Amino acid sequence: MAEEGEVSALVCDNGSGMVKAGFAGDDAPRAVFPSIVGRPRHTGVMVGMGQKDSYVGDEAQSKRGILTLRYPIEHGIVTNWDDMEKIWHHTFFNELRVAPEEHPVLLTEAPLNPKANREKMTQIMFETFNVPAMYVAIQAVLSLYASGRTTGIVLDSGDGVTHTVPIYEGYALPHAILRLDLAGRDLTDYLMKILMERGYSFTTTAEREIVRDIKEKLCYVALDFEQEMATAASSSALEKTYELPDGQPITIGNERFRCPEVLYNPSLIGMEAVGIHDTTFNSIMKCDVDIRKDLYNNIVLSGGTTMFPGIADRMTKEITALAPSAMKIKVVAPPERKYSVWIGGSILASLSTFQQMWIAKSEYDESGPSIVHRKCF
């Protein structure tokens, strides 16, 4: 266990899009790779090529031209446990090069996940990887830790799920947590669709990865959508070019801000949900009237989908319009927010006060997977 001080805990933030893994106490994850398992589309014909039946992470990404890529985590929930096991195996043995039976492991999950999801995670860690101890933490809570606060509302938006989690004095307020199954992957799909209207066809799982890259490099959030649309229509100042892997350039104009606009107006993709600003506001309104002021003043952005330029200004504008007029609104967008869940996990797992919180293997052997609900909130 961690008391001796030599053995550091492992922190593994399994996102729908990327796995962030490393050692507790470090200030950044050692390994960041896509949560992808790829399988060959065609059978191998070359003798001695040593073809594998599956590839994980970056290797799957680099061979994507011949593979079908699958993400085992959808909307923050593991949908394919065999593939998930491959990802964990890859994380421990290939990326971090550690023996999991020697280190406590801190895992993360989305709030409001099905109970069975955490139980299965717990079971695989103890039974397949023989870890000595483990813990499952809520992603948004870790992000708040990383920002150095104990009170605030975290808007955490990754590749698969977005949620707003109000936290007061270190406690998440479960009744006020809201979840929106709209995140980065949906934006990528929408960008594929609107690029199609421009005459660029992206259809395969491999081509989706190209569009994701376009999204990450060129998209931004407009402060005023209508005004930006007018600007885009009247001049080509907003146009940018992107070079495809085969050298062909494509031009992208109003798609740059139309894509992330979905976050504020999900009806653009036919979703009946309200936008991230309304979700944040609704979440605050579900909290006790006495603590709302502290939440308005500490709106913390977290996750890769909050990395769009202009998102904090737009968020401030939208929340200001919804909140009482004299209310002080502060949106915090830490530069490292893409990894703030992992960083918070690194901080938590290295606290001396946390060491009694781990679920030990002996406790698991006694109580089974359901122990996770008693020990982890």
UniProtKB/Swiss-Prot annotation:
One of its GO terms (cellular component) is cytoplasm. InterPro entries: Actin, Actin/actin-like_CS, Actin_CS, ATPase_NBD. It holds the Pfam family Actin. It catalyses: ATP + H2O = ADP + phosphate + H(+). Its main location: cytoplasm. Keywords: ATP-binding, Cytoplasm, Cytoskeleton, Hydrolase, Nucleotide-binding. One of its GO terms (molecular function) is ATP binding. It is found in: Cytoplasm, Cytoskeleton. Its EC number is 3.6.4.-. SMART domains: ACTIN. The keyword Repeat does not apply. Actins are highly conserved proteins that are involved in various types of cell motility and are ubiquitously expressed in all eukaryotic cells. Belongs to the actin family. This is Actin. It comes from Volvox carteri.
